[in-house]
Design a protein with these regions (language model features):
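N-terminal switch/interaction subdomains of large nucleotide-dependent motors and GTPases
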Residues: 1-183
Length: 183
């Protein structure tokens, strides 16, 4: 991990911590469903990126599976994400990690999946789809056994990918999808 270098000189605003990149918004007052929206701060941040190549690592998994802790380890244990309380929405570390002259790496810490309240909505699918379509690498972090983890992941992936197929009107190929690691 010592080869990572944080590149704070790139930005007008000094991002020295994680911030909410994507938040959930109710489309109307009494809705059980939520839409995901990029926050104003997130949009400002993304507009400042000037790398030719950006790699994105998304950490997904069940609630209370230590996704924030794993995100901090990937960043070199700098306590970028608050792992003392459950994350809501999607957070991103405020500095891209330089991986070469024109390549940066971004780390996303997502809200936990499989919450009882989310069983009545499509929120888990939205988190999965967003992670799937934007990431170079998706890490599924879990406290379950790998067998249970793969069963849950496969079920969510099947539902989510069928939603993508409906929207895109075509099957996704392996080049359209991120690498997936189970931790």
């Amino acid at each position: 991990m010592s080869s990572l270098s944080l590149t704070s000189e790139k930005f007008k605003k000094n991002y020295t911590s994680s911030f909410k990149l994507i938040t959930r918004v109710k489309p109307f007052k009494d809705s059980l469903e939520y839409n995901l929206e990029v926050t104003n701060e997130g949009m400002e941040y993304l507009n400042q990126l000037d790398s030719n190549l950006i790699g994105i690592i998304s950490i997904i998994g069940p609630e209370k599976s230590e996704k924030s802790f794993l995100s901090n380890l990937i960043l070199g244990d700098i306590a970028a994400f608050d792992s003392s309380k459950p994350s809501t929405d999607i957070y991103m570390w405020g500095q891209p990690i330089a991986q070469g002259e024109n390549t940066d790496l971004l780390v996303l810490d997502t809200e936990g999946l499989y919450k009882p309240i989310n069983s009545k909505t499509n929120f888990d699918k939205q988190i999965f789809i967003l992670s799937c379509l934007t990431s170079s690498v998706m890490i599924y972090n879990t406290n379950d056994t790998i067998q249970d983890c793969i069963l849950k992941f496969t079920s969510l992936a099947k539902e989510s990918l069928s939603c993508i197929k409906k929207i895109e009107g075509k099957d996704l190929t392996s080049t359209d999808l991120p690498l997936v690691y189970f931790v």
